[in-house]
Swiss-Prot record:
It is an enzyme of class 5 (isomerase). GO terms for molecular function: carbohydrate derivative binding; D-sedoheptulose 7-phosphate isomerase activity; zinc ion binding. Homotetramer. This is Phosphoheptose isomerase. It holds the Pfam family SIS_2.
Amino acid sequence: MYHDLIRSELNEAADTLANFLKDDSNIDAIQRAAILLADSFKAGGKVLSCGNGGSHCDAMHFAEELTGRYRENRPGYPAIAISDVSHLSCVSNDFGYDYVFSRYVEAVDREGDVLLGISTSGNSGNIIKAIEAARAKGMKVITLTGKDGGKMAGSADIEIRVPHFGYADRIQEIHIKVIHILIQLIEKEMVKA
């Protein structure tokens, strides 16, 4: 009954991944991001991750697999997803939703830490403000974006962009794969002397 729709969805996902893989700069950006994160951890730094909606879930997934585990047992790595409901509701109420991530960055981060901002459109005002706060603290910034990068284009030390202009779920599918690869590479970097 739905076989054609299922095949169509899976083929579109495969095409989106194939298009992403065609650009070697994407592979290079993933490698550079993993090394940047591992170097921060080795120097006593941490990563804060943030996003909205499905990207918020990706930010939490990223932090959880760093502090918990990915495929193998190993020490936890310092990662925090900005997801504390009391913080989010307080700042939303008192300052506005655009400040929910930047206030946390201002309070918790320091030079040497890394911010991972995830936005399929690249236009999330609260992530843009978090990037600005991170820059003011002397932090490094990695972004996972889509389409043309939106307003976040060019704002990060490393941008990993999925150049897909259709529905956001296709971009999110690549983002979660990138997140898993980042963790795998971080684990390899962390065991190096």
